[in-house]
């Protein structure tokens, strides 16, 4: 099993546990050059709130989407949008990535902006 298969296995197990708990899910999608986050409803089919470094207004404000500073802004923005939609309690789905760097920065910013997980 290589590194990517291990990450995908961890992500799958996390999503199964979150689905069994019937919780709203804050999912993080990380690439080499961008980061995005989405809050899904408990059924897992409806996106309640989303934010990404690929959004037009954010691309102009953020020089590079692959830094922790960009992740902080995305975390804050997705939390504000989720709270506005009435979602406060979420389960954090880090997509199998380590809780470190950009993932950690996004999570801490989301907590500071009002999400609880």
From Swiss-Prot:
GO terms for cellular component: cytosolic large ribosomal subunit
Entries under InterPro entries matching the protein: Ribosomal_uL18_bac-type, Ribosomal_uL18_bac/euk
Coiled-coil portions: none
GO BP field: translation
Listed GO MF terms: 5S rRNA binding; structural constituent of ribosome
SUPFAM superfamilies for the chain: Translational machinery components
Xref: CDD domains: Ribosomal_L18_L5e
Keywords linked to the UniProt accession: Ribonucleoprotein, Ribosomal protein, RNA-binding, rRNA-binding
Subunit structure of this chain's protein: Part of the 50S ribosomal subunit; part of the 5S rRNA/L5/L18/L25 subcomplex. Contacts the 5S and 23S rRNAs.
Protein name: Large ribosomal subunit protein uL18
